[in-house]
Every structure is written in structure tokens, then in C-alpha cells.
Amino acid sequence: SVITGAVSAVIGFFSFRLRGIYFGVGTIAFAYVIYIIAQNWVELTHGPMGIPLVPPLRLLPESVGVVGRDVQTRIAVVSTIAIIIFGLDRLLHSPIGRAWHAVRENESLASSLGISPLHYQMAAFVLGAVISGLGGGFYAHYVGFISPTELGFHYIGVVFIMLIAGGAGTLPGPIIGSVVFGVLPELLRVAETARNLLLGLILLFCIAVVPEGLTGIWNRLRPERKAASDRPSVATVPGVAAEIVSPATQTGELKLGGVFKRFEGLTALSDVTLNVQPGEVVGLIGPNGAGKTTLFNIITGMLAPTGGDVFYCNREIGGLRPYSIAALGVTRTYQITSLFPELSTQDNIRVATHLRSCRSVLAALLRNKRFRDSEAAIDQTVDRILQLVRLQSRCDLPASALSYGDQRRLEIGLALATGAGLILLDEPAAGLNAEETDELCDLIRRLRAAGFTIIVIEHDMRMVMGLCDRIVVLSLGRIIFDGTPTAAAAHPDVIEAYLGTETADA
């Protein structure tokens, strides 16, 4: 298991540079290389002849003959499986498991919330390899023989079928898949010639009809949990108001000095210099293509600047990874809503509390006091944020089932849950009606009063003028104005950028 884990770490180091289907192809290619090496390294593996006479597993000395060797092996296997399932269940119901789910659903969003995708992908990859290596060791002792053919594509395909048919991304899925596809071949022996065809048809059925696997059928048929709307919402109880949250990280000045960003021959940002003080609400406006979202991407680490400096709290953040910048107290929302669609509303927010949580593997397994206190505090934070963004009555709904306006509010809830002191909102009022926009403005004012620093990209000029302390205007990648909303409304360069030269002259 240790050797398997070490080898998987090396393979993962190279494979995780790939994305999507290329990652799968890359890992299969590595498996095939190992298979070829095992087939041809005769001195170590005996080649196709394999290694015979592997001694059976013994838990008790030979002098104790009460329990046979086969029974001892079965006891060891069952006990190990039980321990692994218990441990995995605890990990999956902890910040570690939430991070795995987040990276699987929306890697870029997870990164902006302070979760390192590569760290958690590698951890899952190595853990899976260690468990597989342990299973291979038990198999060798039970059968008494090791052959390189066990590494062939046939066995890789069987494991893949078990995973897909059972349900990927769940703990019961692979267990159900392994049981079903361990029993099915025996049941189908009566149709020996058509057995592989029938197994293939079952797999195609799962992919086409129930892509989430056999566990998905259970999830569809089981009684739905009681809807959150049937429970009393604290936000709707008379005399109880949603308590504003405060930044969990220190807040400080954001300084941009001479920032440039070039994409091959295109200059998206040119000599952008900007200072944002703690507790300010700054509106970043400009025509489409002015470079507003590009500037957000640079501040939050989605893009590295071509030149210039970006400092937050007197620390250089330009070029850092998004999760590193989030850990320093900077997060954002997106122009196009970005959530974890399959997770419930409250679980979306719970994922976003990652930086506040106890992320120790040992604590997650033991459920010690530190872990329990951390999870209790997170539950309270989630409840407060649900009240604050007025989504408590929809807390059990998946994010994909929320209305567009609710999804926008949930995005802000995710940003608040990180504990960041600087929040960048990219067109938060897009698609909202006038009443929802007013509610959003009220929320932003309350956040400013609580100590948050907020930069808003917005095209709703009524909202910007009534909400922001300062207005910064970008045009063609340059700042053409930085001042009060009143001065911005009368500035000729701002009018020209929005309305055109002829209208400005008129």
C-alpha cells in the first residue's frame, strides 16, 4: 500500500496537469506502461509466468489451529473493509469531503473560496491508490499467486464499470457497484456466450438512463426530506432580525500600481493604478470590453498581471493562486452565476466556510472536541448567512433549482462565508428587478457598516450612484476617472466613454 501510494503520487504529479478526458487517458496510459514493465521485467515479476506460492495471510500463529487460514483471511478483509468505509464516511462528512465535492463540481469556484484543487485531487488520488494497493495485497495472499495479467485492461474496465454503474462521487456507489458486478457474472454464467454483451448493455443502461448510477435510482425513489419551507424560518419570526456577519480576516488597503495585462497582441489593461481603503464601497464602471472583469481576475488570482504590482494588507498578491489570495481575505462573485449546482443552498454556503473550518484528517476521523466545536460554529455561521441573504426558506433546495435572483444572493452568501474582508461583486444586480436591487443595496450598506470593503462592477447607474463612496471608470483598459459619484456624472470623459463624442459635445 505504501509503495502504491508513492507511485500514485508520482503519477498524479504529472497527470493532474491534464484536464477532463485527457486526465483519464493519461492515467490509463500510465497503467499500461506499468503493465508492460511488469510483463517484461522477468527478474522481478517472472513475466507472464507470475509469482507463485505467495504465503497465505496469518493473523494467529500456527500453534493456534482453532481458526483456519481462509477464515483468518476473510476476517482480515471484512474488518479492513469496515474500517475503510467508516473512515471514508467520516472524511466525506467533514470539511475534507466538502472540499472534494466542491472541486468535483466547480473547480474554479472552489479555488476562489480558498480550496486548493490540486491538493485535494492529489489526496483523493493517493488515498484511492493506497486502498487499491491494500486490496491487491489481500488478493495475492488469498489466491497465492500474482500475475502481470492482473494489470491488464480487462480489470481496469471492470473497475470502471463498477464505479459508473454504482454511482461515482458517492460512498455507497462503488460498494454497490462492486457487489452487483461481482455477483452478476456468476448469475450470467448460464448465458456464457452473451455474458459480456449483457454486462455491456447494463452499463449502457446506467449511463443513458441513470447517469448517477444505481445510487441515483435510490435517491429518486426515496421519500423527499421535509422541505425547508415547512419549517419555521428564523428570518420570518417576528422580532428576530438577521445578524450581520463580520470579516473573519483582517481588512486592509488594496493597492494596484501600474498594472498591465496583455493577451498576445491585445492590451486589456494599461497602467492601472488604484487604491481602495478599508470599509469603502467602490463602483467600477465602464463600457463593455473596458477591462473590468480582467481587473477582477488579476486581483483574485484568476490571471497573473503582465506587469505592475498588486498589494493587499501590505502583501504582494499579484500572481498568487486564487485559493492563496482567498486565504488572505479576498474573494469574489462572477459575472455569470457560479455555484455548486447539485449541492443544496445551505451546503453551498457550508462549503464556502472551508477557511474557517477544522481541516485536520485526524480530527475528522476522531471527531474530537476541536472538530465538533468548529462544525457547530460553522452551522451557526451558515444559519446567519442564510438569514442575511434571505434564503433560509430555500436552504434544502439544490442551487440549480433557485431562481436567478436567489442564485445571485447565494453567490454573495458564499463570499461572506469565506470570512474575506474584501469582496468583489461582478454585476450582482444583473437580472434583478427594482425591488431585489434595492434589497441588494441595503445588504451592501450593512456589510460596509460591518467593516467589509467592497468593489462593485455594475451597469445599473442608479444603483452605483446611490450606493458607492467612489466611482472608478475604465475605458479601453485605462482609468479615466476616479472620484465621487456626483463628479462622475458631470465629467466629460465619463460621458464620452458611455454616450459617445457627439452626444457629449451636444
List PLM regions with ranges.
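Compositionally biased, intrinsically disordered low-complexity regions
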Residues: 49-52, 202, 215, 231-236, ...
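ABC-family P-loop ATPase nucleotide-binding domain
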Residues: 217-260, 503-506
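Intrinsically disordered, low-complexity segments enriched in proline/serine/threonine
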Residues: 54-58, 97, 213, 240, ...
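Transmembrane alpha-helices and adjacent helix-loop boundaries
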Residues: 1-234
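Alpha-helix initiation/capping motif
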Residues: 68, 72, 76, 89, ...
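Intrinsic-disorder/low-complexity coil detector
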Residues: 47, 51-55, 60, 222, ...
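Glycine-rich phosphate-binding loops of nucleotide-dependent enzymes
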Residues: 249-255, 260-506
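Residues at structural and domain junctions
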Residues: 1, 65, 69, 86, ...
